[in-house]
Curated annotation (Swiss-Prot):
F(1)F(0) ATP synthase produces ATP from ADP in the presence of a proton or sodium gradient. F-type ATPases consist of two structural domains, F(1) containing the extramembraneous catalytic core and F(0) containing the membrane proton channel, linked together by a central stalk and a peripheral stalk. During catalysis, ATP synthesis in the catalytic domain of F(1) is coupled via a rotary mechanism of the central stalk subunits to proton translocation. Key component of the F(0) channel; it plays a direct role in translocation across the membrane. A homomeric c-ring of between 10-14 subunits forms the central stalk rotor element with the F(1) delta and epsilon subunits. Belongs to the ATPase C chain family. Its main location: membrane. The keyword Cell inner membrane applies. The keyword ATP-binding does not apply. HAMAP family: ATP_synth_c_bact (MF_01396). This is ATP synthase subunit c. InterPro entries: ATP_synth_csu_bac/chlpt, ATP_synth_F0_csu, ATP_synth_F0_csu_DDCD_BS, ATP_synth_F0_csu_sf, ATPase_proteolipid_c-like_dom, F/V-ATP_Csub_sf. The record marks 60 as: Reversibly protonated during proton transport.
Amino acid sequence: METVVGLTAIAVALLIGLGALGTAIGFGLLGGKFLEGAARQPEMVPMLQVKMFIVAGLLDAVTMIGVGIALFFTFANPFVGQLAG
C-alpha cells in the first residue's frame, strides 16, 4: 500500500509540475506572438488582445483541471480503496 501512495505522490508532483511548466511555455509563446502581431499591424491590436485573453484563459483552464485531478488523487485516492477490498 505504501508503494501505491508513494507512486501517487510522484504522479501528483509530475502532474502539477509539468502542468505549470507547460503553462509557462504557452504563456511565453502567446505573449511573444501577440507582440509580433501588434508590432506588424498596430491597427489590429484590440482584436488580437481579445483573442489573446481568450486563449490565455483556455490555457490556464487546462492547468487548473490538472491541479483538480492532482488534488483528487491526493485526498481521495481511488487506488488505495482497491487494495483494501
